[in-house]
Amino acid sequence: MFMIYPLLIISNIINFSKSDKLIFAGIHFRHGARGPIKLGRNGQDLLGVNWTSTGELTPLGQKMHYLLGLRNRQRYIKEYKLLSEEFDPHELVVYSSDINRTLLSVTSHIQGLYPINPNKEDVLNPDKLDEAVPPINITFDDISEAINTLNISALPNSMTIIPVHFIDFSIDNSVECTEKIENLRNRNDRKKESIINFEKGFKANYSEVLKKFYQNKIEIDLNFTMITHICDATVADHIERRNMTEFFKETNINQEDFINTCYEALKINFRDKLFSDDNNELLLFHISYIIEKIVHYMKQRINDDIKEDISSTNFSDYSSPKMLILSGHDTTLTAQELFFIKFFNYELESYIFPTFASQTAFEIARKEVDDNSRKNLKYSDYTLCHYFNDKLVFNMTFDTFLEKIGKINLWNSDNINKFCYGEKPILTTNLIIIISMGVLALILIIIVIILIFKIKNQKDEYLISEHHPSTDDKCCSSEEDE
């Protein structure tokens, strides 16, 4: 059995009790199992295993998130009654990065959170079924059969569909920013002792056999970046139980040791390279927007909970979501957890590489109070618990959390522009439009002024010619008189 690194708990504070009222849950998870990021032209990864595409979610990855969705249904719908049994758009908001594997993961997750229910009552009016068709010709056999099968159901087996919004986890994908980030990360490679030592150890154990394996296949420079690519393929193959016999037979490498070494390589890569610059610029660049969004939804929910009239049936006044779901990557989960480790002063060794379908949660609860007392609640009456894969990372009152966050200079667009482009002013689309309109207006003003001067000059010349005839005119007239 291969070791999957467990989270080291960085707090042993007891969770809130089940008698408390859970009012909010913010979920941020990594996508499920995927194919390797690097594939050769022949469709093989760096271990010689065949794949059909790079980095796409696999059926195993879909199942991971379906089961995680079922687990979250048990906790947040059945156990804590945070969400309704059926999807309510006022209760849940879902975001994903604009990447296939995160979108498919969150779609699979939702099917577990709100499973297919053949016995669910639909809202279609039987008298209106003739109108429940698109305005084009659909009179062929397959569709006719589907119409009869659906009857008063909107979708087969009353499956639930939920809107998913895009969130730009990377914030800025410009060439200048990408180059700046890569240069900063490469400088970290050269100075981080953990990276240097790991690379030396890896080469000592595996360099010769790997070079022999790759001989006449690809040219390989066994630096730390290449090591992480090899390990990415190893982890993907291992999770999927792909046939790696050829690789381990040819190299004579101990499979269990190599897989554990690869998990360690990925951990060091994320912890000590991707977000480890001295000024935390890479960390703040990637995570500020996500932290602000999570905090925004938490504050909004608490504020509405304080003023909420539970007897009201008007959702327009109290429509802040009770749950936020973010479908992200190992980079986004790592950035989030390193943010708390560094700025909340926890031990760096508590970081753990987030494996496929890892989940973090922000849960807010309070003591049960009667309706009259609720309006007197304060942020200090709400407890925030943060978990990584069900292990408690920290808990504190919400006012303490906001105080800690308030001391951190989260980045805005100005910080990002300065980081990417230096002190040079950045011409955004709106600014370019404004400047262009200003230039056009100035040109029009100049043209109008020139026209006014021309008209005035022509008028003056006309008046002069009327009152003071030219000498030539006088001569001509005299000659004619003679």
Question: Residues of each region from the PLM?
Answer:
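Cytosolic C-terminal tails of single-pass type I membrane
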Residues: 459-482
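Sec-dependent signal peptide recognition
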Residues: 1-9
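Transmembrane-helix exit/juxtamembrane "anchor" motif
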Residues: 445-463
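Intrinsic structural disorder/low-complexity segments
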Residues: 15, 34, 332, 433, ...
